[in-house]
């Protein structure tokens, strides 16, 4: 409960540390749903799973999806490909999936196509999918409502390094910086740290423009 920004409850109630400390628990499965429908799926999956598991979900309301269907058993460590396009991949965890989809729609209108992945799991990661993205995209942007240190983006970076792909693709990590977060309205705080649709759109666009500049800039020849 209260995974992520929870400023309405006071600055000591933000749930920003859980990804980092839960990743260190051996053999645990750690997950976060994109909405209330997937939350039911994850609760069902945790009940059926033979092993330790943890799920984070945010304070507040759902996004309004239909929850009348029977819950679905999810494959542990399997992400969901929400959108497949272009040379950019936005890999979002939990509450950041829907803002990432909105950002991708806006980017598409400007000619920047982006794949969007609902990571679902931070442990275990969907290594086959993430490594495939690293080999086929030129930019991966991870988005999480948690501290960057030891978080979801760090887990992805570790995976790329372990497979020798850290220099194959540009990785940009979006999340909460290394500072104490004040009390405040969650929507305003998320916007302040660039973790809403506008912030994700701006960061992806800036990153693409930077890569384009590097691609067109003449390379120096050292004799």
Which stretches of residues belong to each language-model region?
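Internal gly/pro-rich beta-alpha loop/helix module
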Residues: 8-26, 32, 36-47
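A structural motif
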Residues: 27-28, 52
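Thiamine diphosphate
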Residues: 2-15, 48-223
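Short active-site oxyanion
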Residues: 28-30, 88-89
């Amino acid at each position: 409960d209260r995974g992520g920004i929870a400023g309405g409850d006071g600055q000591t109630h933000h749930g920003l540390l859980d990804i980092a400390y839960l990743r260190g628990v051996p053999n645990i499965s750690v997950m976060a749903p994109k909405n209330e429908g997937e939350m039911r799926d994850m609760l069902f999956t945790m009940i059926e799973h033979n092993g330790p598991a943890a799920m984070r979900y945010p304070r507040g309301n759902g996004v309004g999806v239909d929850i009348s269907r029977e819950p679905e058993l999810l494959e542990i460590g399997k992400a969901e490909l929400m959108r497949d396009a272009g040379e950019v991949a936005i890999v979002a965890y939990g509450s950041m999936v829907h803002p990432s989809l909105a950002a991708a729609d806006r980017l598409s209108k400007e000619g920047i196509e982006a794949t969007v992945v609902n990571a679902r799991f931070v442990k275990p990661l969907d290594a086959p999918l993430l490594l495939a993205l690293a080999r086929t995209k030129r930019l991966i942007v991870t988005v999480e409502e948690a501290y960057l240190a030891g978080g979801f983006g760090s887990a992805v970076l570790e995976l790329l390094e372990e497979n020798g792909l850290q220099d194959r693709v540009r990785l940009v990590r979006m999340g909460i910086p290394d500072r104490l977060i004040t009390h405040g309205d969650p929507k305003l705080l998320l916007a302040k740290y660039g973790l809403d649709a506008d912030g994700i759109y701006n960061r992806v666009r800036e990153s693409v423009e930077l890569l384009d500049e590097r691609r067109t800039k003449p390379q120096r020849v050292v004799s």
